[in-house]
Amino acid sequence: MRFGFSTAGESHGPAEVVIVHGVPAGLRLLAEDVDRDLARRQLGYGRGGRQKIERDRVEFLGGVRHGRTLGSPVAMLVRNRDYANWERRMNPAPVEDPPEPITLPRPGHADLAGMQKYGFGDLRNVLERSSARETVARVAAGAVARRLLGEFGVRVFSAVYRIGEVAMDRALAAAGAGKADRSEVRCPDPEVSERMKAEIDAARHARDALGGEFVVVAEGCPPGLGSYADWRDRLDARLAAAVVSINAIKGVEIGDAFEAARRRSSEVQDEIVRRGGALGRASNRLGGLEGGMTNGEPVVVAAAMKPISTIARALRTVDLSTGEEARAFRERADSCAVPAAAVIGEAMVAVVLAEAFLEKFGADALEDIRASYEHYMRRIGLPARRADA
């Protein structure tokens, strides 16, 4: 089975659940590997009150024994501590005194289209699953992918380079992505970080919210992940789809795509050069991807996130129970979630790269995958990377 995952759970239900399939046997995997990324997702200047309640910790339900994967699906659970405050409203069992339905859909959310699609009379049935709380499960799956990629020296980082009108050079942000965890807004430039925080404070004071842009960088990918032979296997398309599936992400860019559209071809292509005894590139304007495949340079994927749709200053809507104009229902939300989205972006990029890696080198046992990888790297004249390389 191909590497991938499925999630289940509602925002204020008992737990978020994820099943990761296609995980090879023999991979070292500990709860702390997952908890580290779960904690990073919860950080970030501008987060809402929910993060003061939750203390996300993973529980393995299957697929791992004594710290090693078994080759069977890895099942994980992250409990929602806030469920204790929502048990009557979100109990899976019938209740004698159900809560009043919510009929004031919020612009920018899945509320109205979701109610129309599924025939619901209560938008709670939509917003609970469409909530970004589901990304807890994605980050857990991404942590498994990160551990697998790490065995072969592939590392995935992210950095925020824009929040609202405050921005830094994206190339500099990508180069400093390994240091982004030091910043409350995941921006590697300390001076820009402070201006971003001030921008978030101003939006919060105005009872509003901010979006922004982040970049994910994957270093150490061997050439040849993905394929040009079938459109479904093209890696840039798969990466773009995975990243834009994150809540509130409205645009994705591979390398310098939009800048390249304004330049001549001779100014855009990454020329092939010798690096010692191996082949490399003189630049990385195409973001490490050519013809739907990795080319050995760092994979660079940027994303644009719109502002969180739920704001204190409720927007106009129509009450579906009366047909009258009204103000939208307000659910607790963040002022800015771009730093958290960057961590989720890492997870989605890691999942896609892990899937492509196992397609190329096999998927049953880690030992066999390593042998296949090392043989391939010898054949193309590049050194094989190891864990922590």
Swiss-Prot record:
UniProt protein name: Chorismate synthase
TM region(s), chain numbering: none
Source species: Rubrobacter xylanophilus (strain DSM 9941 / JCM 11954 / NBRC 16129 / PRD-1)
Cofactor note: Reduced FMN (FMNH(2)).
S-S bonds: none
Pathway membership, UniProt: Metabolic intermediate biosynthesis; chorismate biosynthesis; chorismate from D-erythrose 4-phosphate and phosphoenolpyruvate: step 7/7
GO molecular function, one term: FMN binding
Residue numbers binding NADP(+): R41, R47
Named cofactor requirement(s): FMNH2
Known function: This reaction introduces a second double bond into the aromatic ring system.
GO cellular component terms, A-Z: cytosol
Keywords: Amino-acid biosynthesis, Aromatic amino acid biosynthesis, FAD, Flavoprotein, FMN, Lyase, NADP
A GO biological-process term: amino acid biosynthetic process
